[in-house]
Amino acid sequence: MAIPRLFFLFYYIGFALFPFVSSETFQNSEQEILLAFKSDLFDPSNNLQDWKRPENATTFSELVHCHWTGVHCDANGYVAKLLLSNMNLSGNVSDQIQSFPSLQALDLSNNAFESSLPKSLSNLTSLKVIDVSVNSFFGTFPYGLGMATGLTHVNASSNNFSGFLPEDLGNATTLEVLDFRGGYFEGSVPSSFKNLKNLKFLGLSGNNFGGKVPKVIGELSSLETIILGYNGFMGEIPEEFGKLTRLQYLDLAVGNLTGQIPSSLGQLKQLTTVYLYQNRLTGKLPRELGGMTSLVFLDLSDNQITGEIPMEVGELKNLQLLNLMRNQLTGIIPSKIAELPNLEVLELWQNSLMGSLPVHLGKNSPLKWLDVSSNKLSGDIPSGLCYSRNLTKLILFNNSFSGQIPEEIFSCPTLVRVRIQKNHISGSIPAGSGDLPMLQHLELAKNNLTGKIPDDIALSTSLSFIDISFNHLSSLSSSIFSSPNLQTFIASHNNFAGKIPNQIQDRPSLSVLDLSFNHFSGGIPERIASFEKLVSLNLKSNQLVGEIPKALAGMHMLAVLDLSNNSLTGNIPADLGASPTLEMLNVSFNKLDGPIPSNMLFAAIDPKDLVGNNGLCGGVLPPCSKSLALSAKGRNPGRIHVNHAVFGFIVGTSVIVAMGMMFLAGRWIYTRWDLYSNFAREYIFCKKPREEWPWRLVAFQRLCFTAGDILSHIKESNIIGMGAIGIVYKAEVMRRPLLTVAVKKLWRSPSPQNDIEDHHQEEDEEDDILREVNLLGGLRHRNIVKILGYVHNEREVMMVYEYMPNGNLGTALHSKDEKFLLRDWLSRYNVAVGVVQGLNYLHNDCYPPIIHRDIKSNNILLDSNLEARIADFGLAKMMLHKNETVSMVAGSYGYIAPEYGYTLKIDEKSDIYSLGVVLLELVTGKMPIDPSFEDSIDVVEWIRRKVKKNESLEEVIDASIAGDCKHVIEEMLLALRIALLCTAKLPKDRPSIRDVITMLAEAKPRRKSVCQVAGDLPIFRNSPVVGLI
């Protein structure tokens, strides 16, 4: 009996201890599983360095893994949470993840994973939260998570997932957050989602979903946020959405939605944000919208909405943004809008609104931005628009406003842009604009303004653009050109008289000066040549007299000079045609005389630009008379002493020789002359005009246009810009379908005309250019501007590119235009990726490698999809050997690598430095040499100094893009760090372009996403006016 009793005693003790032994053994097993999980990861920052076995490990060791970074255990010692966000991890998520049966939370967000998720995730039936957002996971999203009955949060946003949404997620009836924004999902929303009665957040924006917006979403009564924009959803907005009484945020922007806005939305009393912009919505605005009493942001822009703005909009007392631009609205602007106490942005431009602006607009709200341009509005401009002292942009152009400009407008200290052109404004320009510290842009053209331009405008330190053309102004301040930052001054078609002001500061910034069609008299001031940055000077149709100042030939950036329709006398300065930048010269209808200079520009000038000067001759005009030619050479007949007999012999012989030469010369003159004008036919007669232009088109692909088609567009009105090596024209080639190309006419380098060695040097340089153009013509990459071909003759080369409709990156970033392009970080990031990929192609996929040498924002063009294209290879170098040496420093100030200035050695790292500066522009919004920098430093040194002082780098990022969105700030700071690596002082410390690609991929932002919750959204984040106020 004793033996059985002992047996049962030990059996009982063993059975009682089994759970503890099993538990301890399994916990030890979880340590091994974690280590196996870690072995599949790449951890460059060593965040998981404490994940290691204890030194004196025993079978029943302490549960050390519960204290490892990111690991959280439950009360029984099992792994319950794995929180590994923001650790720069990459690699693969191991199948071992399924071996944590108690795992409730898995957070891998904001890392650098570029793999697929294991299907075994479906075995984690205890899972409540899974967050894999902001990575580059690809493939289909794992099926089976719907079996986790307690699942509340699924966030897979900002990845590269594709395929269809898992149908089984509809079984997870406890789900509260479902976020799949910023991926490549397609198909429709699964019908099973109708079961998600506890769902509060539904984010599917930025994918490829199609079909109709499911009506069943309107049955999910717990929903607070719906973000479905940037997809291909069609059809109408479900009326059922009006049942979502808890809804606070509705985003259906940028899709193909049609029909009317449901009136049922007016029942949503908690709704704060409605974004329906860029769809095809029609019909009238429902009056019931006035019932959304909590509404803060309402953006219905870029649709086809008709009818009037309902008066009930004036009941939305919390409204801060009202954007109805680019619709088909009619009627008046309701006066109650002026009573909205929180209104900051009112955008109504490009509609057909009539009547006047509400009299009290601006007096009851902190109005920051008013744009009602391109309507049919009339009446006076309200005087209280800046009553709150917050107004930054006043855009009223292309209407029928009348009366005077209120004096209160020019006492508004926050104003940045004033655009009131194309109205019926009368009276004088009020004084005070020179005292406005932020005013940059002033457009008052095409009105009925009279009187003088206020003297204080010349005192402005911020004004860069002034257009007062097509008015009746009569007095111009003598110091108008002294404004230190003035870049464009257009005052044509006025009644200005007297002499042109000549008070010019030492280093003026003026680039465009247009005083045409006025009554200016006297001579052209010599001091105009002090405008070192002047590109275009237009003085046509005045009453100017005297000679053309010789100093104009020394203006190094002047490209367009129009002096026509004046009373100028004397000769055309001989050096004027030798200017390497001057492309357009018009001196027609003056009183000029003497022979046309024979150098450079004048060899190809259009005779129409010279007509109306009876004394001009030679060149493309009829030849000069003998007496004029002799006098032009300074000969004195009184000093000619020859024997009459000898003289007669010489004359007779000369006549015979001259007759033969005249015939040959006549044909030569006609050939050159007929290239540009039929004017020559009035003087020389031939049987048959030349049928073809002496230009040749060399095509790099099949083209549907000719050299003549290109040449017919080389005129001033088609100029769209200038680069390092030429002037760029837009050419709309007349073929069906219409094709638009960009043509770059290369600058001519000046050289002595009679030097044989220099002539051979010119030929060698031209051969080099053609050789280089041919090489570049073979480049094929989506981020390189495609060269279609080139047109050339014996003297000049014009390169033909595909046309980029969105201009260059520099303008997009730094232009103060209120409708600029890159209004969010995602767009800027994509530009950066495009530039890096284009450079990678040049450096690694071309043989020999191509070093661009002039990477800068102005040489990065944007196509119709805002994708970056590298352009302007005028300084490009084919690098056959490492560290090749060039003969001189080339590039653009602010972008040039420091070693380039003293070694003249180039390699890929020179381009990397310039790329880093472009990245800094994208992140900070600053120019390489920005007026806000002290001590004349550049953007690189500006940031380095902040780093040395341990100042927060969050202060340098572009606040208009980042807003208050924390994850956007983090993403921009990542890009900033990459830029700092690229701009390291020593070339060896800079990454290769392939390394930049890797790092930039790790900094990938959330695709078309917003902040996690509506409360974390920066103001106007998803609206077309984001970042513009």
From Swiss-Prot:
The modification Phosphoserine is found at residue 887. ATP binds at residues 720-728, 744. The chain crosses the membrane at residues 645-665. GO terms for molecular function: ATP binding; protein serine kinase activity; protein serine/threonine kinase activity. Keywords: ATP-binding, Cell membrane, Developmental protein, Differentiation, Glycoprotein, Kinase, Leucine-rich repeat, Membrane, Nucleotide-binding, Phosphoprotein, Receptor, Repeat, Serine/threonine-protein kinase, Signal, Transferase, Transmembrane, Transmembrane helix. LRR repeats lie at residues 81-100, 101-124, 126-148, 149-172, 174-195, 196-222, 224-243, 244-268, 269-292, 293-316, 317-339, 341-364, 365-388, 389-412, 414-436, 437-461, 463-483, 485-507, 508-531, 532-555, 556-579, 581-604. It catalyses: L-seryl-[protein] + ATP = O-phospho-L-seryl-[protein] + ADP + H(+); L-threonyl-[protein] + ATP = O-phospho-L-threonyl-[protein] + ADP + H(+). It is a single-pass type I membrane protein. The modification Phosphotyrosine is found at residues 801, 841, 895, 902. SUPFAM superfamilies: L domain-like, Protein kinase-like (PK-like), RNI-like. GO terms for biological process: cell differentiation; phloem or xylem histogenesis; procambium histogenesis. Residues 1-23 form the signal peptide. Residues 24-644 are extracellular. It is an enzyme of class 2 (transferase). Residues 666-1029 are cytoplasmic. It is found in: Cell membrane. The active site is at residue 854. One of its GO terms (cellular component) is plasma membrane. Its EC number is 2.7.11.1. The modification Phosphothreonine is found at residues 706, 903. Residues 714-1007 form the Protein kinase domain. Disruption phenotype: Reduced procambial cells number, and adjacent or interspersed xylem and phloem formation. Belongs to the protein kinase superfamily. Ser/Thr protein kinase family. Interacts with HIRD11. This is Leucine-rich repeat receptor-like protein kinase PXL1.
